[in-house]
From Swiss-Prot:
Gene for this chain: rbcL
Site (described: Transition state stabilizer): 325
Organism: Eriodictyon californicum
Compartments it resides in: Plastid, Chloroplast
Keyword vocabulary terms for this entry: Calvin cycle, Carbon dioxide fixation, Chloroplast, Disulfide bond, Lyase, Magnesium, Metal-binding, Methylation, Monooxygenase, Oxidoreductase, Photorespiration, Photosynthesis, Plastid
Protein name stated in the entry: Ribulose bisphosphate carboxylase large chain
Enzyme kind, highest EC tier: lyase
Gene Ontology MF: a single term: magnesium ion binding
Length: 467
């Protein structure tokens, strides 16, 4: 007779191991599992562990040719989610040998590849990952990181200011460059290509790069400050993307940009590597993230996508505002902002952090607050995000009644006033509006901005909430 018993067997017999002690080298995952009616949580959790590691739906004779005990994922703990019927957090440990070194692509293919279409589950969400130091060390991470960026730009002790050029589509390269110049001349540190701006018929990429470089050099000469424009190198194939980054380097500009989810992790890691070797900073936009992270019970939480970006490489990444028009509940947002910036982050479920994460000196990423923010939000942004952040006002700069440069002036004055007040020990949460009003006396540009945006609010209930 054959040396194994054929047929379908329950996953939990092999893959549910509550007695397992996790290793320091394991990758740990926290999944929010919603089983189909009648499927016990142990079976559902074990199924997730199996299908995202060594398992298949039946016993196969080739199982005997390897050591399942060495390579299988294990569901080692299950917690019911409070307030939800039949929903569980299942913790899974994966042996490090299952993953290719330095490949975010392979890590995701394994952990979230097949299992999300699994019939025994109604829904599945990856809430958090613990990346062990042994695996972190196989990644180069951000091209430069927060400290090196500050040194390159010679800007310290305050958040950096940006602005997305609008209208995002339709401007000619010359007019686009003019808008860039006005914003930088007015006092911003950076301007930004919109994520949709690649190389369209109305503005080919090379023309845009040239006019933006001219704007950067002119504004630098006039202000004595280092300026940058995020030139979007995202393209239809990776060779073209690198070609655009090479051209940016030849122009001598400080920073390029990439849409890391639509472009893909493989392309992103290649670009990050090029940027490191050639002294370019890399700004990352998260277009498409909400498709993946918006549903509470299915998909991947953004904190996982943020960790993945830090491994793949990027110096800035968009991370919500807490205020403004885009999603972000304060504690949760600050949780993944710290995961981006800090070297060591303690487990803290009140901030949505399921595991203690040690980045072992991988460079940090600057979070970018962008989307529906204006001068009245400045006090909150400075208080929430602190100095290591980029605050991006698109409409909040270009929508100024007097034009782009005065819009930039208003934002810079508002920022400097808030930072100075904070440094003097004043309470931004309580006195913030007063601080901005005082600054209006010295800046007619700020006064005009405060008047325009005094009534605007985006009031909707948060979607991304804690249990």
């Amino acid at each position: 007779s054959v040396g194994f018993k054929a047929g379908v067997k329950e996953y939990k017999l092999t893959y549910y191991t509550p007695e397992y002690e996790t290793k320091d080298t394991d990758i740990l995952a926290a999944f929010r599992v919603s089983p189909q009616p009648g499927v016990p949580p142990e079976e559902a959790g074990a199924a997730v562990a199996a299908e995202s590691s060594t398992g298949t739906w039946t016993t196969v004779w080739t199982d005997g040719l390897t050591s399942l005990d060495r390579y299988k994922g294990r569901c080692y703990h299950i917690d019911p989610v409070p307030g939800e019927e039949d929903q569980y957090i299942c913790y899974v440990a994966y042996p490090l040998d299952l993953f290719e070194e330095g490949s975010v692509t392979n890590m995701f293919t394994s952990i979230v590849g097949n299992v999300f279409g699994f019939k025994a589950l109604r829904a599945l969400r990856l809430e958090d990952l613990r990346i062990p130091p042994a695996y972190v060390k196989t990644f180069q991470g951000p091209p430069h990181g927060i400290q090196v960026e500050r040194d390159k730009l010679n800007k310290y002790g305050r958040p950096l200011l940006g602005c997305t050029i609008k209208p995002k589509l339709g401007l000619s390269a010359k007019n686009y460059g003019r808008a860039v110049y006005e914003c930088l001349r007015g006092g911003l540190d950076f301007t930004k290509d919109d994520e949709n701006v690649n190389s369209q018929p109305f503005m080919r990429w090379r023309d845009r790069f040239l006019f933006c470089a001219e704007a950067i050099y002119k504004s630098q000469a006039e202000t004595g400050e280092i300026k940058g424009h995020y030139l979007n190198a995202t393209a239809g194939n990776x060779e073209e993307m690198i070609k655009r980054a090479v051209f940016a380097r030849e122009l001598g500009v400080p920073i390029v940009m990439h849409d890391y989810l639509t472009g893909g992790f493989t392309a992103n890691t290649s670009l990050a590597s090029y940027c490191r070797d050639n002294g370019l900073l890399l700004h990352i936009h998260r277009a498409m993230h909400a498709v993946i992270d918006r549903q509470k019970n299915h998909g991947i939480h953004f904190r996982v996508l943020a960790k993945a970006l830090r491994m793949s490489g990027g110096d800035h990444i968009h991370s919500g505002t807490v205020v403004g028009k885009l999603e972000g509940e304060r504690n949760i947002t600050l949780g993944f902002v710290d995961l981006l910036r800090d070297d060591y982050i303690e487990k803290d479920r009140s901030r949505g952090i399921f595991f203690t994460q040690d980045w072992v000196s991988l460079p940090g990423v600057l979070p970018v607050a962008s989307g529906g923010i204006h001068v009245w939000h400045m006090r909150a942004l400075v208080e929430i995000f602190g100095d290591d952040s980029v605050l991006q006002f698109g409409g909040g700069t270009l929508g100024h009644p007097w034009g782009n440069a005065p819009g930039a002036v208003a934002n810079r004055v508002s920022l400097e006033a808030c930072v100075q007040a904070r440094n003097e020990g004043r309470d931004l949460a309580r006195e913030g509006n007063e601080i901005v009003r005082e600054a209006c006396k010295w800046s007619p540009e700020l006064a005009a901005a405060c008047e325009v945006w005094k009534e605007i609010k985006f009031e909707f209930k948060e979607v991304d909430t804690l249990d």
